[in-house]
Amino acid sequence: MGSQDLASLIGRFKYVRVLDSNPHTKVISLLGSIDGKDAVLTAEKTHFIFDETVRRPSQSGRSTPIFFHREIDEYSFLNGITDLKELTSNDIYYWGLSVLKQHILHNPTAKVNLIWPASQFHIKGYDQQDLHVVRETPDMYRNIVVPFIQEMCTSERMKWVNNILYEGAEDDRVVYKEYSSRNKEDGFVILPDMKWDGINIDSLYLVAIVYRDDIKSLRDLNPNHRDWLIRLNKKIKTIIPQHYDYNVNPDELRVFIHYQPSYYHFHVHIVNIRHPGVGEERGSGMTILLEDVIEALGFLGPEGYMKKTLTYVIGENHDLWKKGFKEEVEKQLKHDGIATSPEKGSGFNTNLG
């Protein structure tokens, strides 16, 4: 838990500028300051409550909601319309605007996230940016990415992860925890990701953080990890449906890894397949299904992903772009014979031979 109250912090938030506004995901991110320190405030409109997916308190006292079907609720989309204005109509089509009944527990308007104090790394991650496709070779990983990972894995930067794993932070949100000091390798904790409002099962987004600390990212995986990943995948797809009373089934879960990850301690994302996005909204690289990783480790060779070239999207605000990826992409395009940024008026060169 943070040392200060969220409402108090937001009350002291001083607006500076809009970092990003996404009409598709219905998310806005603001840069500001609180008590003279940078802060990033993000608001995301919550998913609709509808009559067949209604939140009810858990009888067992679980920290996460339980969902039942075919129940009528006063805050559902249909019953919650309090005001309606028709914009226009044409034949069988009608358009309008509405106001829905809101309640902080049953039907909140938006999910709010605050990062404070926010570092330049956080700010750049949320800011609008141009994106590029990068082909990361093993040499690029060794010469550019590895030093960057070392910078990002200081005890101070990873403190929040260790707080979750060992200090009881966010225990009230934990969905599942498995840990034994005698078998640290198989231990992991599952809890809601900050992308989930914790209310609607259609937008379910969880993260499983492992206890073992010898794997920073996808790159560290090799065939020796294959059986471990198979066990992890099986446990996730068994535990999560049971926890939510099978309102989400095993084959409705997208279990995947990010590369580049947002932090370099191995973790797995667990998302309802109805969720519209899988984390690439801010140019965060690529996603690869855990089952595809498991299959690939069967034929990649003894060094696994360490010897594979990985192609993904990266934003110009990412430190890796500035630490050498920009120059490497330019070299690759030149090597491939692909022209970039022709001067205006030079015409289109059709000679591709």
Swiss-Prot record:
Primary site of residence: cytoplasm
Region (Disordered) location: 333-353
Any one GO CC term of the record: cytoplasm
Subcellular location: Cytoplasm; Cytoplasm, Perinuclear region; Cytoplasm, P-body
Residues bearing the modification Phosphoserine: S341
Motif (Histidine triad motif): 265-269
GO biological process, one term: response to heat
Coiled coil: none
Keyword tRNA processing: no
Function: Plays a role in the cleavage of a residual cap structure following the degradation of mRNAs by the 3'->5' exosome-mediated mRNA decay pathway. Stress-induced regulatory protein that modulates the m7GpppX diphosphatase activity of DCS1.
Family: Belongs to the HIT family.
PANTHER family: HISTIDINE TRIAD HIT PROTEIN MEMBER, M7GPPPX DIPHOSPHATASE
Subunit (UniProt): Homodimer. Forms heterodimer with DCS2; the interaction inhibits the DCS1 scavenger decapping activity during post-diauxic growth.
Name of the protein described by the UniProt record: Inactive diphosphatase DCS2
The organism of origin for this protein: Saccharomyces cerevisiae (strain ATCC 204508 / S288c)
Designated gene of the protein: DCS2
